[in-house]
C-alpha cells in the first residue's frame, strides 16, 4: 500500500467487506495470492496449467466461467511491474446480479498492507478472504496492569481497542485498631494475604502476556494504580523476568478497572504517541481547541465547508470518520460533454439512480447516466494528495471519533490559515 496509512486501511477494510459479500453461482470464483518477491512468470505458468485442467469440468457453464476468470487474472498480471514488494492479491469471477443470466465478470486487484507470505490459488463459490483478516489486525499490543491492595485489572490496548482480560479482588482486610501480639499477628496475616494477591496477579499476567510476547507483538507493559502497591509489584519478583523487561513506566491513578485503563492512557500519552488511539485523540482535541475560540480559530467542519476549503488548498489536516457513508458520483450526459460530480449518501444510491432516470441534461436535454462511483474517502484522499494535505480516517469506537461523526457529520478540518 502507498499513501496515507489510515485511508489505505479504511479502503482495504471496505474492499474486504465487499468481497466477503460476493457469491458465485457455483465453484467458479478464483482467488490468487501472490507472495512478495515471487516471479510473476511463475504465477502465470501455474495459472495456464489450471486453465488447461479446467477443461475437465463437467458443467459447461462453470467451465466457461472458471476459464474466463483465470484469463482475466492472467491479463491483470501482465500489467503489473516487478518486483512486488508486498505481493498482490487478485479475485475474479462471474457474480450474479439477479436471476439466471445476470452474471457479470468482476475483478479486484488488492495491494496488501503487509507482505503476502504464501502462494494461494483457490476456486470456490466464495472468494477466499481469510488471510485478509490477518492483514487488518493491529500487531502491536500494550499490556496494562492496574493494582492496589484490594483489586487488580489486567488488560490490553491494541490499536483503538481496550480489552479487559481479568479482574481480581484480594480479600485483604483494611487497617484496624489493636495492640500487642494480636496486632502484630494480624499484621503478618495481612501482609501475607497481600503477598499472595501479588503472586496471583503475577501468575495471571504471565498467563495473559507471555503468549503475546512470544509472538513478538507485546510492545510494552504499563502499570498503574493508587498508592504504592504498583511500585512494589513492579520492583519485586512477582512478574515473569521477561515481562519485567517490558515495563515502560508506572502511573499514579485514581481508579482501577476499565475507567482506570482510560485514565492511564491519558497519563501515558507522551509515551504512546505512536498508538493509533493517541494519534486520533490528540488530533481531534487540537481541532476542538480551535473550534472553541471566539472566532472559530483554524477549524472547519461539515461537508460543504470542508469540501470548499479543501479545493482551495487551505486545509492542513482533514479528519474523516469511518462511518461517513458518502459516495462521490460522476454524472454525464450521453448526448453531449456535460458532466457533474455530486456527493450522495451511500444508502440512498438506489433512490438517486431512479431519480436520475427522470432528469434531463441541463445543456442539451439528453439522458443522464452514472459514469463513476467512488468512495468519498478515496476522493478526499486524492484531493489531499493534490494539495499536500494530511488526512486521517478515525474510528467511531472512540469518544472523540464519535463526536466528530455525530456533531459534524463525519467531516472536520484544521486549517493552514484563517479564512
From Swiss-Prot:
Which terms in the Gene Ontology molecular function aspect does this entry carry?
translation release factor activity, codon specific
Per the UniProt entry, the signal peptide is: none
Q: Which domain of life is it from?
A: Archaea
One GO cellular component this record assigns the protein to is: cytoplasm
How the protein assembles, per its UniProt entry? Heterodimer of two subunits, one of which binds GTP.
What does it do?
Directs the termination of nascent peptide synthesis (translation) in response to the termination codons UAA, UAG and UGA.
Name the UniProt record assigns to this protein = Peptide chain release factor subunit 1
Give the species.
Answer: Methanococcus maripaludis (strain C5 / ATCC BAA-1333)
Encoding gene, per UniProt annotation: prf1
Amino acid at each position: 500500500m502507498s499513501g496515507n496509512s489510515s485511508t489505505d486501511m479504511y479502503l482495504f477494510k471496505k474492499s474486504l467487506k465487499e468481497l466477503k459479500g460476493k457469491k458465485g453461482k457455483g465453484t467458479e470464483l478464483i482467488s490468487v495470492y501472490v507472495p512478495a518477491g515471487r516471479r510473476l512468470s511463475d504465477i502465470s505458468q501455474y495459472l495456464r496449467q489450471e486453465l488447461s485442467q479446467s477443461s475437465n469440468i463437467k458443467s459447461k457453464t462453470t467451465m466457461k466461467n472458471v476459464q474466463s476468470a483465470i484469463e482475466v487474472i492472467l491479463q491483470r498480471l501482465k500489467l503489473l511491474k516487478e518486483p512486488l514488494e508486498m505481493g498482490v492479491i487478485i479475485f475474479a469471477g462471474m457474480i450474479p446480479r439477479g436471476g439466471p443470466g445476470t452474471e457479470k465478470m468482476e475483478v479486484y486487484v488488492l495491494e496488501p498492507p503487509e507482505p503476502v507470505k504464501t502462494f494461494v490459488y483457490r476456486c470456490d463459490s466464495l472468494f477466499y478472504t481469510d488471510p485478509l483478516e490477518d492483514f487488518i489486525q493491529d500487531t502491536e499490543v500494550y499490556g496494562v496492569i492496574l493494582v492496589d491492595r484490594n483489586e487488580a485489572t489486567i488488560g490490553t490496548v491494541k490499536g483503538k481497542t481496550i480489552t479487559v482480560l481479568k479482574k481480581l479482588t484480594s480479600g485483604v482486610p483494611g487497617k484496624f485498631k489493636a495492640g500487642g501480639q494480636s496486632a502484630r499477628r494480624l499484621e503478618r496475616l495481612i501482609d501475607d494475604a497481600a503477598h499472595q494477591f501479588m503472586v496471583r496477579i503475577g501468575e495471571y499476567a504471565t498467563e495473559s502476556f507471555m503468549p503475546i510476547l512470544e509472538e513478538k507483538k507485546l510492545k510494552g507493559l504499563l502499570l498503574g494504580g493508587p498508592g504504592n502497591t504498583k511500585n512494589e509489584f513492579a520492583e519485586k519478583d512477582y512478574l515473569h523476568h521477561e515481562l519485567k523487561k517490558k515495563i515502560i513506566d508506572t502511573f499514579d491513578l485514581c481508579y482501577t478497572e476499565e475507567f482506570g485503563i482510560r485514565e492511564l492512557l491519558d497519563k501515558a500519552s507522551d509515551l504512546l504517541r505512536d498508538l493509533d488511539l493517541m494519534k486520533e485523540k490528540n488530533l481531534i482535541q487540537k481541532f476542538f481547541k480551535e473550534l472553541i475560540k471566539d472566532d472559530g480559530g483554524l477549524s472547519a467542519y461539515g461537508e460543504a465547508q470542508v469540501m470548499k476549503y479543501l479545493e482551495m488548498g487551505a486545509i492542513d489536516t482533514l479528519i474523516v470518520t469511518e462511518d461517513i457513508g458518502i459516495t462521490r458520483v460522476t454524472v454525464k450526459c450521453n448526448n453531449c460533454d456535460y458532466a457533474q460530480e455530486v456527493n450522495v449518501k451511500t444508502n440512498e444510491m438506489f433512490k438517486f439512480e431512479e431519480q436520475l432516470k427522470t432528469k434531463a441534461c441541463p445543456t442539451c436535454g439528453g439522458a443522464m447516466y452514472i459514469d463513476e462511483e467512488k468512495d468519498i474517502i478515496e476522493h478526499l484522499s486524492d484531493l489531499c494528495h493534490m494539495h499536500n494535505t494530511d488526512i486521517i480516517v478515525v474510528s467511531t469506537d472512540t469518544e472523540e471519533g464519535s463526536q466528530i461523526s455525530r456533531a459534524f457529520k463525519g467531516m472536520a478540518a484544521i486549517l493552514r490559515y484563517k479564512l
